[in-house]
């Protein structure tokens, strides 16, 4: 069923959806619509006036990232807030690692899988949204001759297993994406540590 935009505009829909999450977990979420990527950023309590309220910024890429519907992007980023993505612990874990960016991207793939599994289970209509998005993003993955762990995880997550089925450690990466589903807030951290050696 198509939403009547004369009754509820896109902006109102986004604000109301954001408001539900804010109320559910006592958070303040600043919603921005800027160029670039969709993201969720946590602002530590030391920077906040109200120590009982967690503060986040969520950006919804405008124009939209190819293959990602803007409302689906909002639901995904709100999932990071709702399912308590461990922003501070992963930064502490990685510390000053020379591979910080690479490791963080791998962790993020696992964390995205974790939060979307919860959203898909608790809000059944979202499953189709996320599957459609993953498939669209998979079609955008360029073929590679060699497979690093990040590419392998993305290909599996985006329904493009055939591209990496012969990759070294394929089975470990596939298992990791299964193991992280429906885990607690530290599930992606634990799974990340279990595959770091690969």
Regions found by a protein language model. Give the residues of each.
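Short, functionally important secondary-structure microenvironments
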Residues: 1-198
């Amino acid at each position: 069923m198509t939403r009547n935009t004369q009754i509820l505009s896109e902006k109102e829909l986004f604000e109301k959806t954001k408001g539900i999450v804010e109320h559910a977990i006592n958070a303040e979420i600043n919603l921005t619509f800027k160029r670039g990527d969709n993201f969720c950023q946590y602002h530590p309590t030391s920077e906040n006036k109200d120590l009982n309220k967690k503060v986040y910024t969520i950006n919804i890429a405008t124009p939209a990232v190819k293959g990602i519907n803007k409302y689906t992007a909002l639901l995904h980023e709100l999932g990071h807030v709702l399912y308590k993505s461990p922003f501070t612990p992963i930064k502490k874990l990685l510390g000053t690692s020379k591979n910080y960016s690479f490791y963080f991207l791998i962790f993020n793939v696992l964390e995205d899988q974790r939060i979307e599994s919860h959203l898909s289970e608790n809000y059944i209509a979202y499953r189709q949204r996320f599957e459609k998005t993953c498939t669209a993003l998979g079609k955008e993955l360029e073929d590679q001759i060699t497979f690093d762990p990040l590419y392998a995880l993305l290909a599996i997550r985006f329904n493009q297993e055939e591209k990496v089925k012969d990759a070294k450690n394929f089975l470990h990466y596939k298992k990791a994406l299964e193991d992280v589903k429906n885990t607690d807030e530290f599930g992606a951290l634990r799974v990340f540590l279990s595959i770091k050696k690969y």
